[in-house]
Amino acid sequence: MTSSSSKSNKSRKSSKAAKDTTPVHESASRPLSKTPPPFRNHIVDKRGLKQLVAWAYKNHGTAVTSSMADKLKDLGFRYATQAAVSISVNDLQVPEAKKALLGEAEEQITATEERYRLGEITEVERHTKVIDTWTETNERLVDAVKKNFNQNAPLNSVWMMANSGARGNMSQVRQLVGMRGLMANPQGEIIDLPIRTNFREGLTVTEYVISSYGARKGLVDTALRTADSGYLTRRLVDVAQDVIVREDDCGTTRHIVVEAEDGRFGNRLVGRLTASQVVSAVGEVLAERDTEIDPPLSKRIEKAGVTAVSVRSPLTCEANRSVCRKCYGWALAHNELVDLGEAVGIIAAQSIGEPGTQLTMRTFHTGGVSTAETGVVRSVVAGTIEFSAKARVRPYRTPHGVNAQQAEVDFNLSIKPVGKGKTQKIEITNGSLLFVENGQTIDADVTVAQIAAGAVKKSVEKATKDVICDLAGQVRYEEAIQPREVTDRQGNITLKAQRLGRMWVLAGDVYNLPPNAQPVVQGDTEVTEGQVLAEASQRSEYGGDVRLRDSIGDSREVQIVTTAMTLKDFKLLEESTHSGEIWNLEAKDGTRYRLNTIPGSKIGSGEVVAELADDRFRTGTGGLVKFAPGLAIKKARSAKNGYEVNKGGTLLWIPQETHEINKDISLLMITDGQWIEAGTEVVKDIFSQTAGVVTVTQKNDILREIIVRSGDFHLSSDSKALERFEGDGHMVNPGEEIAKGLSIQDMKYVQTVETPEGKGLLLRPVEEYTIPNEAQLPELSHVKQANGPHLGIKATQRLAFKDNELIKSVEGVELLKTQLILETFDTTPQMTVDVEKAPDKRAKTISRLRLVILESILVRRDTMSDSSHGSTHTELQVEDGISVKAGDVIATTQILCKQAGVAQLPEATEADPVRRLLVERPEDTTTLSTSGKPVVAVGQRIVDGELLAEGDPSSCCGEVEAVDSNSVTLRLGRPYMVSPDSVLHVRDGDLVQRGDGLALLVFERQKTGDIVQGLPRIEELLEARRPRESAVLCKKPGTVEIKQGDDDESLTVTVIEADDAIGEYPILLGRNVMVSDGQQVTAGELLTDGPINPHELLECFFEDLRSRKPLMDAAQEAIANLQHRLVTEVQNVYKSQGVSIDDKHIEVIVRQMTSKVRVEDAGDTTLLPGELIELRQVEDTNQAMAITGGAPAEFTPVLLGITKASLNTDSFISAASFQETTRVLTEAAIEGKSDWLRGLKENVIIGRLIPAGTGFSGFEEELQKEAGPHPDILSEDPAGYRRMQNLRPDYTVEMPPAASSTAVLDDPSDADLEATRTRHNIDPSASNFAAFARPDADNELKEEQVVDAEAVEGLQEEGLLSDD
């Protein structure tokens, strides 16, 4: 009932007070509690109010509480009005301390930036430190705000509002009067520029923009959260809807243990029933089994020093498909034992789902892990540090880049004071950080150590960050880095740093050379401004005639004609039509070719240049193609371009006209089989082109097509002939007799057709087309270079159709095309051919077609210099129209020096030529004069502040180039720290430009607990999701041994188990081992860091217990372990967000998730292997097997997520209404399932009364037990009587009337019984008592039967009882 809103001491005091503060008004109704309310005088804040109302409700009922709440409201408004509490801008007081705090933070950050500049810390360490600094400053500022209000204006309205819990909280007040703090960018990374101002002072433009990122995120977050939370509730309700309290006591002895946290139970025991005696430390019995624990008893148990209490819980309840009252405990609505028929499942689901909207309000994390979790210890005295004898430490570098030591064991550290005084002792725990050495002398108030808070196993993740170069120059490694090459499985080689070390970039002007440029200067030579540093030339590949084109953009194109071919015998003519230009080639004999491309375009090899314009092979209509013997075509891969003719011959063509129609049959104007003349209208608006016999194809009253076959029609009765030409028909040669008295002069195609007049033969005309063996080729002349690609043209004939192909068409088609096709040999596929129009050499008016292959070379323009390129100068070495040979230089480009200096070249290798060169300019070096003799040597690298000579610190970083008696010359540079295992992108001696990536730092950052927290985390737990990279879990208990793998990266953890068996666990790269050599581990313990896979955990528990215990016990215990874990995890998420939910709600849901087992081996039972079934059912089945001696079923417990559990419920109606409706219903139908309508959902869907509350079926039975048989027994009721719904408890009639008219109220005679038996077909072996008497609750206790006068009277009136 309580909620923790403010943690200040004052509210604690007031809450104590508020528990019994109730000045209840006299006029209120009679109090339920006998104790008079005590009087307390205290500040009441939100928490106090909550407790006050709760107290009133508990002790005095609803009415009193509501009237009291009303009075409190009036009180509040009245005094708020009198006090004139309002808010104005002046109430937002910014604390004085803010300036100083920000100044301090700035100083720390400047120092950090300086350390980064000097290469003492890596980029990651700098970022972490900056973020942590700001986070800490923000925290301190909040304290300053609190302090300021508390001391100077405790009645400030903003402060009162936030502090009392009325509205708002400190984090919001902080933004009003403190500072807005760090913000995340849209990717969720923290921007290391915090918003220093608050809303009172106003934000700068930059801050405003940064700030609005966060605001938008909040809005989107809220919208999404509502949807997610609703869906979560729906799934929860679905999984738990059939959990109803169905019995009073299941009688189980199983229980769960609730342990005290810091000696306190809080509210965790209240409302539970004890599972066994609770005995205090001194042996006093505090509570017997099944005692309800109320707050006073809970307090007494706490006071008696009891640390663990075993209580009954829904998790261990053995009621079938439900929970019993005693295991559930109090219904939290009215703090009394839960009623029968209460739908606790739905209440649980809503209790967990509803706060979902409050979760993840504060999703993003404020930055690096705050160091507040670990306690910093400072020295009290000045003295000498001494470690105790067993101390073991190893060097450690903190996330802020401070070198320290980490303790490997627990030990004591003492500081012995220099003079008199007490020795300071500090207990150092394993994992703590020490900032001092053994034997070191320190001053007072120095940070000595950071004590690790317990064995906090934080999960870490690998993250990477790029190191970007800030200046151009040459890379130099320090010795310390020790780079090594690592080859991965794909054979890629990466360079990795092995140790922490610096990488230097020494300044210089770096020139990027264009491709194929060669340096023309030597290394270490002086160069002047404008001098040529490198030269690149562009050469022709094949040679040929040069054409210079006008420049396009920033480059000029030089074209070299390598091959050209002119079609000499053809004139190129241009015709204009309304659809555009058409180009034709005309031969001397007047044949024309249509050009498929237009001059100025490009074509590739194998494409058609032109087609013969020829009407000889054009048909009048569609028809049937037949090849005469001898005509052959090439097989083509696709018929898109037709089939090439291999060998000429004759092609036969049988014309037929086909109209494709697809219209309604009512539009048909002729009949099937009719002979029509040319020009007949066959369908509305469609006319036949030829005369002939019509065939109509239709389907479902839709006209598909109409075919007109021309020819001569002869009615014939010659059945042999008709049969011969049935179907497709065939060719008949001239002079052959077709039927009696019918022979032909020309070749015909004969077919049998049916017409309205009768059957007959249709003699269809055949057209012959002669196809030459090969197409004639026009004369070509072409020029070919000595080694250029070859060009040619070949003429081919292509048939558009295969043998026997039917062409459905009304217009004619082109049967044969003669095409000119371009051929190029020995070429690259990318090569294209340009089509050009060229004037004839002799007659200038005539144009010819010319095909050329061009080599195109783009020549760069001159460019001015920029930061990474020198200025370039390009000269053409050729003129228009001259001829060049292959390999001749067309143009040269020179790279010119920007500024005088000394040129340096990196070493070139075969594999990689020189791509960059460096010029060391005068401003890249500096000479520092020293007062004394320098103490540095040439080649040494120096950072700011290092001494050059006695008393002369250096003012810049760099490498010593020369040393004189009183001066030092430095080449300026910049150090970058790289951490171990970083990937190095550059090698020693490489040249880099500003902005290049130098390395990829690999670092571990602690997973911020809130990446997966709030709703997603709850969902992850309840859906029992398998995490992507889960931790390695130990399967059996034993002792750990850690072995190094073959390569230095891989590890194997072996666990030596009790029976000397050895379990091996290979550890993947990048995983941190959480155990140490020789440590004892238990089953299910983490061997590496990472999220836990709950399924794997259950398996570990079960496997381990299975070896020591019977199957059933092992399953129950493994499930119990997992249940406990799940409940705790879910609670942790809600607690971290300040939401309090009673454990029992979570337990009800977890119970549903863990209620099933998977059958592995069915034994002699009727179960199926692999089937999911309730643990209880298997238990019952196996007990039956034990009695009959059959083999029991083997099974393993399973954990189902809420969605899975909902779909696996016994009721298919409920499952189908949840998700995957079709699948669930189909399966149920195939398996022939029955739904027993046990849950609420099934009943609601079908429209029955739900079995909860007053519809709870247990109540019917109770009533029936009390009421006995109903007197209005219908004579046709076969088994004696029917129990009616409207049972009236005032009837006490025991016996049904006898067969005769006289009713006998004592035991009936045998004859009567016999008669009744025969009348009702009752088996004579059934006992008389069972058949006729109402079974009592207890047969031994016979009730005294009193005749009820009214009842007898009623029976007599109805003629069921004689008057005597």
Swiss-Prot record:
Manganese among keywords: no
Region (Disordered) location: 1-42
Record GO terms (molecular function): DNA binding; DNA-directed RNA polymerase activity; zinc ion binding
KW Metal-binding (keyword) present: yes
GO terms for biological process, alphabetical: DNA-templated transcription
Signal peptide (UniProt feature, chain positions): none
Reported cofactor(s): Zn(2+)
Family: Belongs to the RNA polymerase beta' chain family. RpoC2 subfamily.
Record-given protein name: DNA-directed RNA polymerase subunit beta'
Native source organism of the sequence: Parasynechococcus marenigrum (strain WH8102)
